Amino acid sequence: MGQWGFVPPDSGGDSPAVQPTSTRNSAMKALSTIGAATLLCACASSPMMKVDNAALPEPVRVPAGQKVMMSTSGVGEITYECREKKDMAGQHEWAFIGPVATLYGADRKAVGKYYAGPTWEAADGSRISGKQVAVAPANPGNIPLQLVKADTAIGAGAMAGVSYIQRLNTKGGVAPTTPCDATSKGKRQQVAYEADYVFYGM
């Protein structure tokens, strides 16, 4: 093969055209850039979700100057475990363990995943975690709206530059209503939920 990145094709064959290694490397870098851009477009619901922050509860509004980078719909489940209440011997409650969800673009194609941390991971491998800033009540039977301040992203890609994440339009996900007592201590139960996640940056 020498300096060539590919084996020369037969006339009329389906093999890729011969390219010098330097040319191939440049092409691969370009494809990598295009791939990240494509993922960003996929994550950014098309058309991108419009958010009127002034209409949201004040605790979950993003700071002035933040702009929507992308938005996704999360569909998954939240796990709860029946545990004894802290400092309340003999009393039990459903304790939050963590979420697992798939993130979808507007075309309903998966573009990433969400899991305990909280952490959002794009299909390109870039990911962000963060710390909860505030919550605000949602409609009865739904988990609250939430504002998270993101830590620095890990990996170049769709999540790079994200500074805040909002959880909006929540459906379900609240703790089970089934009994939680000494006989069910340690039992885990998954509850389905949906939410829109809106990612902001400067």
What are these regions (language model features)?
Residues 3-27:
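Short, Lys/Arg-enriched N-terminal segments with co-localized hydrophobic residues
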Residues 9, 13, 47-53:
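Contiguous N-terminal and early-domain "leader" segments and peripheral loops that mark the onset or edge
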Residues 49-79, 86-202:
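Primary mode marks residue(s) on the alpha4-beta5-alpha5 output face of response regulator receiver
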Residues 5-8, 15-16, 38, 128, ...:
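Polar low-complexity intrinsically disordered regions enriched in Ser/Thr and small residues
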Residues 3-6, 35, 118:
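Exposed boundary/loop context
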Residues 29-36:
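Sec-dependent signal peptide recognition
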Residues 41-42:
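C-terminal motif of bacterial Sec signal peptides marking the signal peptidase cleavage site
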